[in-house]
């Protein structure tokens, strides 16, 4: 999982990326291509 300041550019890299908020943190998850996982930090 990558930890990035800005997730907007990462979200646009793959069409299956989803922006998810869990426990006050923002995540990018991708069911089909899991190497795009990221967390904002």
Curated annotation (Swiss-Prot):
<dbReference type="InterPro" id="IPR047621">
    <property type="entry name" value="Ribosomal_L36_bact"/>
</dbReference>
<dbReference type="InterPro" id="IPR000473">
    <property type="entry name" value="Ribosomal_bL36"/>
</dbReference>
<dbReference type="GO" id="GO:0005840">
    <property type="term" value="C:ribosome"/>
</dbReference>
<dbReference type="GO" id="GO:0006412">
    <property type="term" value="P:translation"/>
</dbReference>
<dbReference type="Pfam" id="PF00444">
    <property type="entry name" value="Ribosomal_L36"/>
</dbReference>
<keyword id="KW-0687">Ribonucleoprotein</keyword>
<comment type="similarity">
    <text>Belongs to the bacterial ribosomal protein bL36 family.</text>
</comment>
<dbReference type="InterPro" id="IPR035977">
    <property type="entry name" value="Ribosomal_bL36_sp"/>
</dbReference>
<dbReference type="GO" id="GO:0003735">
    <property type="term" value="F:structural constituent of ribosome"/>
</dbReference>
<protein>
    <recommendedName>
        <fullName>Large ribosomal subunit protein bL36</fullName>
    </recommendedName>
</protein>
<keyword id="KW-0689">Ribosomal protein</keyword>
<dbReference type="GO" id="GO:1990904">
    <property type="term" value="C:ribonucleoprotein complex"/>
</dbReference>
């Amino acid at each position: 999982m990558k930890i990035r300041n800005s997730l907007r550019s990462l979200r646009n890299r793959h069409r299956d990326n989803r922006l998810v908020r869990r426990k006050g943190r923002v995540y990018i998850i991708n069911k089909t291509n899991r190497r795009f996982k990221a967390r904002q930090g």
